[in-house]
């Protein structure tokens, strides 16, 4: 023990001597060296650049190598649209900067989806790196944030194309939508993901962005930008990634919060917990570990044990090394998301909030879904699916309807994402439904085109449609009428037209305005429940607005008798009803066409027949003489009460509303045979025998069939009925002339009286004529002055003589 004590004392003395020596060196130091410790404020521009380069050096590259890279790299200017878009993103989303991480992770997930899909047909695709992950690392010392994925990566050309240019049409649409959203006060943060420009949100928090990427078909390259321009150069380190992309952000001073581990973890959980690949964050944690004791501590412990224990002679055992418990900070990759897909879990185990969070994550929407359904289908094909109805219709829902990708269903095969670009996963009219489908029964190692033709896809589609209609049917009536129908009512009507197999189910989802209520909409089920006892048809009237429909002469008698009439006010409505022959055993009757009949007693029937006989001369005169080439026939009307007459289409002809719609078609050229056929069909002219105009016409034609005034009146009544019945007049000038003639007669003005001619305007004088006239006027004035002077002298002479 005494020897150990002496050795310890010697060590202390030696240490003290070294400290004194260091102190002497510090004292002898120069003033410049002391000042150099605090020269940050007086550094030159070159030193600032050097310090910056040192701060953002990449792994394996020092400051001089970074400088050399920048000098040799090829510089590019951003496309004009990209500059505009970046400015708009930065200015509009500066209050919601955190979405940058969501967009970078989303892009990483897309890259991983692509390489996994490629690997199904190319066994060497994953040779560079077997794992499929996203890793995030914060570097506080260097002010850097790294996001790395092992996805498909980018070639040099793709770096230039994907990160430096954008399709002009897409950019223009994005800018327009951003502007509209800002004007409407709506959130703009979701738009950047929907339009594929999320990468540029990195400049919300970064002064510089460095992208290192390795594609299987190219060497590793580095892309760098400060948002003003960008450069690309081959990575001198070679292939360090194996495959994939690392995005390095040099964070702005005010964005330093995004280097905090808790902040990054919370953002990943908030936005990306349902990404289908593991997301890791480089994290620290405190662990308690066993460490071997040092020799002095071990000897001391052994001595204490030998003093306390009694000497017992036992067989010697092998001595175990002595250890102690120590707390250490350990850094490792921490998994942040539950990578088991939510649709693979039983629906009973998934909370409503999880469905909402998953919907927002994969659809890039900010609102909760209106409805959702989670189910497992079994039978000919087994698959799991979650379907959602969004709260509002996606933008451009009917732009190029059916001709482009329009559905939002992501197809997975054995948890491997295949595509979201199938046109046939959902019918066109359900293009607003979003969701995922995952099946184990579909083949993996085939092309997308081959898979699209697979017979099982038709079975999947059929079940998806049925489940979707079940989901929509379960939406509460109030929510359905107030929200769903306003957003997606047109889709349901198109479904009735297009989907023959589900027409009956879709008909139950239809809603229309009706005469039953001034504002509320009604279903066909509700209409049938309110039908009169002997009513066998569902009556409807089509028009450009409710006001036009309910003021039409065709509904006068129906409303007076208490029949409910459905009002069709949208262009697609009449097509929809025409495609639906009946509902619940009741056929539809367009009240603007032939076939409207009422239940009548024997007495009423006799009275009607007597009226028809009384007006037979007028009806024949109209058909054979006054309106000979304009109508098919003239009859006494059963549907008119206030109007004098109406123009009724045949059962298979066009109503006024349909004719207006067909003639307004953008592709209408006037050469379509069927269109011309329907448009040229003559109509039935119905008269109201109780109207004073009609009764007076009957009296007049009995007196004189060739009365020109009555002939004019008949034509004016026909043309007025044409307009009131919803049709267009082929010759509006002739109609106007006839109205003028009728007004002249009513005011006792001679029909042949001509319009008074305007007085002729005096011709304008030329400059020479003006000068001549001024000269003549001057001479006349001079002559007049002389005559006045002579008369004045004469008068004065006469006064003198007197």
Curated annotation (Swiss-Prot):
Phosphothreonine found at: 785
Annotated ATP binding sites: 107, 149, 162, 199
Superkingdom, taxonomy of origin: Eukaryota
Keywords: Acetylation, ATP-binding, Calcium, Chaperone, Disulfide bond, Endoplasmic reticulum, Glycoprotein, Hydrolase, Hydroxylation, Nucleotide-binding, Phosphoprotein, Sarcoplasmic reticulum, Signal
GO biological processes: actin rod assembly; cellular response to ATP; cellular response to manganese ion; ERAD pathway; insulin processing; negative regulation of apoptotic process; positive regulation of toll-like receptor signaling pathway; positive regulation of Wnt signaling pathway
Residue positions where N6-succinyllysine is found in the record: 404, 633
UniProt entry tagged with the keyword Acyltransferase: no
UniProt short sequence motif SRT pseudosubstrate motif, positions renumbered to this chain: 42-44
PTMs per UniProt: Phosphorylated by CK2.
UniProt note: domains: The SRT pseudosubstrate motif associates with STT3A during translation in normal conditions, preventing glycosylation of facultative sites until HSP90B1 folding is completed.
Designated name of the protein: Endoplasmin
């Amino acid at each position: 023990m005494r020897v150990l004590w002496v050795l310890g004392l010697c060590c202390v003395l030696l240490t003290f001597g070294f400290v004194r020596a260091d102190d002497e060196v510090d004292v002898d130091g120069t003033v410049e060296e002391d000042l150099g410790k605090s020269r940050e404020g007086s550094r030159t521009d070159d030193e600032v650049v050097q310090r910056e380069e040192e701060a953002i050096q990449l792994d394996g590259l020092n400051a001089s190598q970074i400088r050399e890279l920048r000098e040799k790299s090829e510089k590019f200017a951003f496309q004009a649209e990209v500059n505009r878009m970046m400015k708009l993103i930065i200015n509009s989303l500066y209050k919601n900067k955190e979405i940058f991480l969501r967009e970078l992770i989303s892009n990483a997930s897309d890259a991983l989806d692509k390489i996994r899909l490629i690997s199904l047909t190319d066994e060497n695709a994953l040779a560079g790196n077997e794992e499929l992950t996203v890793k995030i690392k914060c570097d506080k010392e260097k002010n850097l944030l790294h996001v790395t994925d092992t996805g498909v990566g980018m070639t040099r050309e793709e770096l230039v194309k994907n990160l430096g240019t954008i399709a002009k049409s897409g950019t223009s649409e994005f800018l327009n939508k951003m502007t509209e959203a800002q004007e409407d006060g709506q959130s703009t943060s979701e738009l950047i993901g929907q339009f594929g420009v999320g990468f540029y949100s990195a400049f919300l928090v970064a002064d510089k962005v460095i992208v290192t990427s390795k594609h299987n078909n190219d060497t590793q390259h580095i892309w760098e930008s400060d948002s003003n321009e960008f450069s690309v150069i081959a990575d001198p380190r070679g292939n360090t990634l194996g495959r994939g992309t690392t995005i390095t952000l040099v964070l702005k001073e005010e964005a330093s919060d995004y280097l905090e581990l808790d902040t990054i973890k919370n953002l990943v959980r908030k936005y990306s917990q349902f990404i289908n690949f593991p997301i890791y964050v480089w994290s620290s944690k405190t662990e308690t570990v066993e460490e071997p004791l040092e020799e002095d501590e071990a000897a001391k412990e052994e001595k204490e044990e030998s003093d306390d224990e009694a000497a017992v002679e036992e067989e010697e055992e092998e001595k175990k090394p002595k250890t102690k418990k120590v707390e250490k900070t350990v850094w490792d990759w921490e998994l942040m998301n539950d990578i088991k897909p939510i649709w693979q879990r039983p629906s009973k185990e998934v909370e409503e909030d999880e469905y909402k969070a998953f919907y927002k994550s994969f659809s890039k929407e900010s609102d909760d879904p209106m409805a959702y359904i989670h189910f497992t289908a079994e039978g000919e094909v087994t698959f799991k699916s979650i379907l959602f109805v969004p709260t509002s219709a996606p933008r451009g829902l009917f732009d190029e309807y059916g001709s482009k990708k329009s559905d939002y269903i992501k197809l997975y095969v054995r948890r491997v994402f295949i595509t979201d670009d199938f046109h046939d996963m959902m019918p066109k009219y359900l293009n607003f439904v979003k969701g995922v489908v995952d099946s184990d029964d579909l083949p993996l190692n085939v092309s997308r085109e081959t898979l699209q033709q697979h017979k099982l896809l038709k079975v999947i589609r059929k079940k998806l449609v049925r489940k979707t209609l079940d989901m929509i049917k379960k939406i509460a009536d109030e929510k359905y009428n107030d929200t769903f129908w306003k957003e997606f009512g047109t889709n349901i009507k198109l479904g009735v037209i297009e989907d023959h197999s589900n027409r009956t189910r879709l008909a139950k989802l239809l809603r229309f305005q009706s005469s039953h209520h001034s504002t509320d909409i009604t279903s066909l089920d509700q209409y049938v429940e309110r039908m009169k006892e002997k009513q066998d048809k569902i009556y409807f009237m089509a028009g450009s607005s409710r006001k036009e429909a309910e003021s039409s002469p065709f509904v006068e008698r129906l409303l007076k008798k208490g029949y409910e009439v459905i009002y069709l006010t949208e262009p697609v409505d009449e097509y929809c009803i025409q495609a639906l022959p009946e509902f619940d055993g009741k056929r539809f009757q367009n009240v603007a066409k032939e076939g409207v009949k009422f239940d009548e007693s024997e007495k009423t029937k006799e009275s009607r027949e007597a009226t028809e006989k009384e007006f037979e001369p007028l009806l024949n005169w109209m058909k054979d003489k006054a309106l000979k080439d304009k109508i098919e026939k003239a009859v006494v009307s059963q549907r008119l009460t206030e109007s004098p007459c109406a123009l009724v289409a045949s059962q298979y002809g066009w109503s006024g509303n349909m004719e207006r719609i067909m003639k307004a078609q953008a592709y209408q050229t006037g050469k379509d045979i069927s269109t011309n056929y329907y448009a040229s069909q003559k109509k039935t002219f119905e008269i109201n025998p109780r109207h004073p105009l009609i009764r007076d016409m009957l009296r007049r034609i009995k007196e004189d069939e060739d009365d020109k005034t009555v002939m004019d009146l008949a034509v004016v009544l026909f043309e007025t009925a044409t307009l009131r019945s919803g049709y267009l007049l082929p010759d509006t000038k002739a109609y106007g002339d006839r109205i003028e003639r009728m007004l002249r007669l009513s005011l006792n003005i001679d029909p042949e009286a001509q319009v008074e001619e305007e007085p002729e305007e005096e011709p304008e004088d030329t400059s020479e004529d003006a000068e001549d006239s001024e000269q003549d006027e001057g001479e006349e004035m001079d002559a007049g002055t002389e005559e006045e002077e002579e008369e004045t002298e004469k008068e004065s002479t006469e006064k003198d003589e007197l």
